[in-house]
Amino acid sequence: MNINKIALIYNQNSKHLAIIEEIKKLYNYCKIEEAEAIIVIGGDGELLHNIHRYMNLNIPFYGVNLGSLGFLMNPLDTKNLLQNIHESTVSILNPLLMQAEDISGQIYTALAINEVSIFRKTNQAAKFRIDVNGIERMSELVADGALVATPAGSSAYNLSAGGPILPLDSNMLCLTPICSFRPRRWHGALLLSSATIKFEILNTNKRPVNATADFQEFNNITNVTVKSTKDKPIKLLFNKNHTLEDRIIKEQFGG
């Protein structure tokens, strides 16, 4: 990629400031608003927070992993950092758009890159109805919660909850229960990315439920609607020999 203006973002309280200082010496970085690419140093959480913060700028992000897992990041390679960016490949992620209503009638909207989840707020299991494209598909699910994951997010919380990993270009979404009690053997569904999923919370007084879109949490929710949106495409840059597609395939074989 022909990228000449690069911005740098990192956590000022990072325990890796010595490494970050070395990276800062490599290039004359510009302001974020002027950049053609944004380098984010840290882990997946740091990258997700900054994507949410700057996604409206429509600038590609290149993550450098100094965290733990770093699934959406590139490995640290200080010596070849700029060359790797120039030779990088682009993965386009379409986030989820969540609309949630709480018990007071307040409406919240949020975007999620990985997943939208709903989960019980107390020791009582959650109860909710599931509609897909306006058609009731499950009259009552009793569980700790449920989530809708994008292909990029399918290897995160979704995988831990027992959901499948989706290829990045699959145009599918995962609908996965979290510790389903009834129906006990239901393991979720694979839906087209064009689907609109609605969760209607049952018995909200006795069984309160919260909802999250990535790291954004909303309390005492009565219903949640989730759908994929192409209005806010997110561009992630990956080293040519370390693409996100390859990582998703590797994850399916325990890599």
From Swiss-Prot:
GO molecular function, one term: metal ion binding
One Pfam family of this chain: NAD_kinase
Active site: 44 (proton acceptor)
Keywords: ATP-binding, Cytoplasm, Kinase, NAD, NADP, Nucleotide-binding, Transferase
Cofactor(s) in the UniProt record: a divalent metal cation
A GO cellular-component term linked to this record: cytoplasm
Positions annotated to bind NAD(+): 44-45, 49, 114-115, 144, 152, 155-160, 216
Catalytic activity of the protein: NAD(+) + ATP = ADP + NADP(+) + H(+)
EC number, as in UniProt: 2.7.1.23
Cellular localisation: Cytoplasm
GO-annotated biological processes: NAD metabolic process; NADP biosynthetic process
Assigned protein family: Belongs to the NAD kinase family.
PANTHER family to which the protein is assigned, alphabetical: NAD KINASE (PTHR20275:SF0)
Function: Involved in the regulation of the intracellular balance of NAD and NADP, and is a key enzyme in the biosynthesis of NADP. Catalyzes specifically the phosphorylation on 2'-hydroxyl of the adenosine moiety of NAD to yield NADP.
The protein, known as: NAD kinase
Gene that produces this protein: nadK
